[in-house]
Amino acid sequence: AESALLTLTDIEVVIARPVLVYGPDARANLRALMKLCDTALPLPFGAANNRRSFVSLENVARALAFLTTAQSEQVSGKIFHLAEPEPRSTRELVSKVREALGRPPRLISVPAFMMKTLLTLVGRKTLYEQLFGDMVADTSSLTAIGFKYLPGDAQIAAMAKAARKN
C-alpha cells in the first residue's frame, strides 16, 4: 500500500513507520509485561539475548516534527523507520523497568528452546517471538538527514511508573 501511495499521487508523501512504541500509556502485551515486572516473581528472561527495536513516544513525536520541517528533497517519497538506534534485549528492558520501580532484576535463565516449547504448548507461540525473537529496524535513513534520538531510559521509567498507577 505504501509503495502504491508513493507512485500514484502527485502530492509529496513521507511515510513514518514506528516500531513498537513505548511510553506512559503502554497498552496490550507491553502493559502486561510492566505489571509482571512490578511483582516480586523471578522472571525467565535472564537468557533473552534477543535484539528488538523500540521507540519512545517522545522520540516518535520529535521525529514526526523533524520530518514535517525537513527539506522536501530529503524526505519526499521516502519511508522512515522510527526506532531508537540501539536495539534492546527483553532482558535489558525488564531490568530497566524493574530498576525504575525500585526492584532488583530477579531474572532467571531459562533456555530459549524451553520457553518456546512451553509457550507453544499453551498456544502462545507469537508471544515467544515477541519476547525472545529479534526484530531490528534500520534507522539510518532518518539519522542520515540529521535526526538525533533521545536516550529512551527516562521514557522506560515513566512507562513503568504509569503502569504501576493504573
Where do the PLM segments sit?
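C-terminal amphipathic/interface module of NAD(P)-dependent oxidoreductases
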Residues: 106, 126-166
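Residue-level signal for the nucleotide or nucleotide-sugar donor/cofactor binding architecture
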Residues: 28, 52-58, 85-88, 137, ...
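Alpha-helical membrane-targeting segments
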Residues: 32-57, 99, 104-136
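Conserved active-site beta-strand element of glycosyltransferases/polysaccharide synthases
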Residues: 13-15, 42-44, 74
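Mid/C-terminal beta-alpha module of Rossmann-like enzyme folds, strongest
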Residues: 70-126, 157-166
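Substrate-positioning beta->alpha
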Residues: 26-32, 46-69, 77-78
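Active-site Tyr-X1-5-Lys
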Residues: 1-14, 24, 30
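PG/GG-rich flexible active-site loop of Rossmann-like NAD(P)H-dependent oxidoreductases
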Residues: 20
